[in-house]
UniProtKB/Swiss-Prot annotation:
This is UPF0260 protein Smed_0627. InterPro entries: Puta_zinc/iron-chelating_dom (IPR005358), UCP006173 (IPR008228). Pfam families: CxxCxxCC (PF03692). Belongs to the UPF0260 family. It comes from the Bacteria.
Amino acid sequence: MGEMPFWKMKSLEEMSGAEWESLCDGCGLCCLNKLEDWDSSEIAWTSIRCTLLDGESCRCRDYDNRQATVPDCIQLTPEAVREISWLPPTCGYRLVSEGRDLYWWHPLVSGDPETVHAAGISVRGRTVPEDDIDIEDYEDYLVTWPLEVGREPAE
């Protein structure tokens, strides 16, 4: 019987830098532009991606320096994970902070970074870059798929 995975044994605060980074499944959902209703505080997702998000790999093109280019980019910390209401329901950070397990398609479980895409979780092929969209047109790009959990593995 194997050793229990680190995300089941450690709190977010106890994780090493490498363990913390590996909780990211590479879906790209957190890098989508979101709209917030000022009255209700409800969050609406768009299919508009951050200027730095690669639409195919679903990874940041300049991760280490992203906040220099995108000053409002959110740096996730254990505290931020617990406070940010818009993290997708499939987010590894959110799941672990809530004491839940990772989904089968998470690369830490599957051993394959492509399963997040095969399961239909990632933004791959479903987004447009924010540089191409006028902010007044963002409502034309509202989507609900970031709130879906994805497909089960094929038998």
